[in-house]
């Protein structure tokens, strides 16, 4: 009789584990500690002078399975990260001198998330001086990150989401560390 009582609980847990969980922008943005490290190295030409164009690529998460990264979530993470290091202006006016264009090219995930989940991402970044139209920076940044089984025991989709967010946070961190080396 006790076993019969466990069946509805097990069914509920399996249904909840099957729901799609989209990646969120804030966990993809760089941490305050990373922002503090980078902020001191930002060239004067980039301080409050980098805007973000509409991000291309990305995919909405399905209702029942998986975890994807939408273009809007990546754009919000980029804007938050640029703001944290002092590159993004506080208001849209006056218009910033530079425009960062980003395209999510690749999101490699396992078909069936197992014990540990490793996700690979590739994002193409282009920084354009809007006054001259000159490309100041262009690079495809690819990296991987993972989420362990212990971080989301019940939900494989939650592990995918965690790995997505970590991989993109590391990707944005690499971008910002590249940008502070430029002298436009």
Where are these regions (language model features)?
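Sec-dependent bacterial lipoprotein signal peptides
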Residues: 1-19
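A structural "domain/chain start" motif
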Residues: 19-76, 179-184
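Surface-exposed short loop/turn segments
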Residues: 20-29, 85, 89-138, 145-158
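Short, intrinsically disordered/low-complexity patches at protein termini
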Residues: 46-49, 123-125, 159-162
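Short secondary-structure boundary motifs at beta->alpha junctions and helix caps
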Residues: 60-69, 131-177
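Short alpha-helical interface patches
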Residues: 71-83, 95
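Sec-exported extracytoplasmic/periplasmic mature domains
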Residues: 79-87, 109, 172-184
């Amino acid at each position: 009789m006790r076993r019969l009582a466990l069946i509805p609980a097990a069914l509920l847990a399996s249904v909840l584990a099957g729901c799609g969980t989209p990646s969120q922008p804030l966990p993809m943005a760089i941490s305050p500690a990373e922002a503090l490290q980078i902020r001191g190295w930002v060239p004067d030409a980039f301080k409050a002078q980098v805007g973000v164009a509409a991000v291309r690529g990305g995919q909405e998460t399905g209702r029942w399975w998986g975890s994807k990264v939408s273009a809007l979530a990546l754009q919000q993470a980029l804007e938050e990260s640029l703001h944290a290091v002092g590159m993004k202006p506080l208001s849209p006016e006056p218009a910033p001198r530079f425009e960062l264009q980003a395209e999510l090219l690749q999101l490699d995930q396992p078909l069936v998330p197992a014990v540990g989940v490793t996700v690979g991402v590739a994002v193409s970044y282009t920084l354009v001086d809007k006054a001259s139209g000159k490309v100041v920076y262009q690079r495809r940044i690819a990296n991987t990150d993972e989420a362990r089984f212990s971080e989301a025991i019940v939900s494989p989709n939650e592990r995918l989401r965690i790995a997505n967010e970590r991989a993109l946070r590391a990707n944005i961190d690499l971008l910002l560390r590249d940008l502070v080396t430029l002298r436009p």
